[in-house]
């Protein structure tokens, strides 16, 4: 009975760990100084608030699980790369539209933290 209790406790701990990991931002250490926080995650839309420390880089990546993606700088100095175009300075208040699968990355080129809001319209919505 003691062994059975230990096995059940271990399984419960494993399930708890797996379910809690699925709710956390994706790989927070993959890009040091880049801190994403999910503000909303529904079947039709996902909204992230991303804080970037000075010099932090969000490496080039794609989103294949969304129809489109809006990138909206809120504060700071962001350099944004979209596809093969030259990087642009993304000023606060501007909005950038990206189709599904568009490679993009960004970095904080300023001396203070920068904040970006990302809105994703999910596939099937």
Role assignments for model-derived ranges:
Residues 1-8:
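Bacterial N-terminal signal peptides that target proteins for export
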Residues 22-30:
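Cleaved targeting-peptide boundary
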Residues 29-62, 66-67, 117-119, 123:
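A short glycine-rich, His/Asp/Glu-containing loop-to-beta-strand
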Residues 57-59, 79, 96, 100-106:
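Histidine-centered metal-chelating micro-motifs
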Residues 64-79:
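Short, conserved beta-strand element in jelly-roll/cupin
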Residues 84-101:
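Short acidic-glycine-tyrosine-enriched beta hairpin
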Residues 101-125:
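Ligand-binding loop in jelly-roll beta-barrel domains
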């Amino acid at each position: 009975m003691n062994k059975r209790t230990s096995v059940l406790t271990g399984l419960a701990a494993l399930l708890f760990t797996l379910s809690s990991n699925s709710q956390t931002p994706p790989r927070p250490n993959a890009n040091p100084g880049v801190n994403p926080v999910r503000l909303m995650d529904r079947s039709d839309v996902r909204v992230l608030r991303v804080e970037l420390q000075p010099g932090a880089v969000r490496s080039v990546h794609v989103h294949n699980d969304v129809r489109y993606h809006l990138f909206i700088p809120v504060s700071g100095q962001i350099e944004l790369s979209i596809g093969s175009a030259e990087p642009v300075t993304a000023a606060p208040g501007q909005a950038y539209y990206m189709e599904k699968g568009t490679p993009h990355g960004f970095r904080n080129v300023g001396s203070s933290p920068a904040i970006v809001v990302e809105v994703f319209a999910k596939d099937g919505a």
